Amino acid sequence: MSRRVATITLNPAYDLVGYTPEIERGEVNLVKTTGLHAAGKGINVAKVLKDLGIDVTVGGFLGKENQDGFQHLFSELGIANRFQVVEGRTRINVKLTEKDGEVTDLNFSGFNVTAQDWERFSTDSLSWLGQFDMVCVSGSLPAGVDPDAFTEWMSALRTHCPCIIFDSSREALVAGLKAAPWLVKPNRRELEIWAGRKLPTLQDVIEAAHSLREQGIAHVVISLGAEGALWVNASGEWIAKPPACEVVSTVGAGDSMVGGLIYGLLMRESSEHTLRLATAVAAMAVSQSNVGVTDRTQLAAMMARVDLQPFN
């Protein structure tokens, strides 16, 4: 049976990724360039899914002035492209990794989405997204997109495709959660902001996740960084800890986890197997300079080393 996924990235970026032992503020810092990638959270998810053999369609907005890198990537990977091109330039995000694994993001501004652009996207996307088994909506809102309009679009999307996977932050996260998507993947800090309080223990995190579920969200996955991830759904609560590995870059690790979650859910795997797979895919991303699953044997070995336990 053919399984199809669409990913929506409203605010993609070219990721300029580099390494420096330590950032010294106010000084000239020498940086080793490790890559320049056409990226964005949903695009990273699409790359992982394509590597795992899933048919993927991507959509969102692209800036007219520097779209070539994205168009080339979609063609090269064989990913169906439904992006809407708007006036302006897609932004550049600089991501610097230090020797201790700390990542500093410098996210520049990009194109502005007009009211007409948004109306066209909203109408067009809702006309074709209903054909997919799952839709992944990821990332931030570009300039010009009203959070309330985004909530309305997400709510309308639910009537066309109930299985929405949502991964965002800040105002986009708050707006999207109002539409009660099927699965959400905040990190611990984002969950604290939503809850309006610190969550110092894992039990606190679990309780906040259940509060989200009470709003109609079926699956809540909380990224804990190097500590792994928690998954809370109607069947139970699990915590997965990734195997130790050399950290090359943490850029795209969260998106890789989302790709693994979607794949496991599409294949109707158990929650335990799916979380183990997603944690392994994220660990693979950390050990390389770009996202993707290039070696299924390596993935299987990584899965075997994931420590997964019921939380209670």
Residues covered by each model-derived region:
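Conserved phosphate-binding/catalytic region of the ribokinase-like
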Residues: 174, 202-312
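Conserved N-terminal subdomain of the carbohydrate kinase-like
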Residues: 27, 51-133, 301-312
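Hydrophobic anchor at the start of a short beta-strand
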Residues: 5, 54-56, 81, 164, ...
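Conserved phosphate/ATP/ADP-binding segment of small-molecule kinases
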Residues: 147-237
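Short, conserved phosphate/pyrophosphate- and ester-handling motifs at nucleotide-, phospho-/glycolipid
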Residues: 49, 187, 254
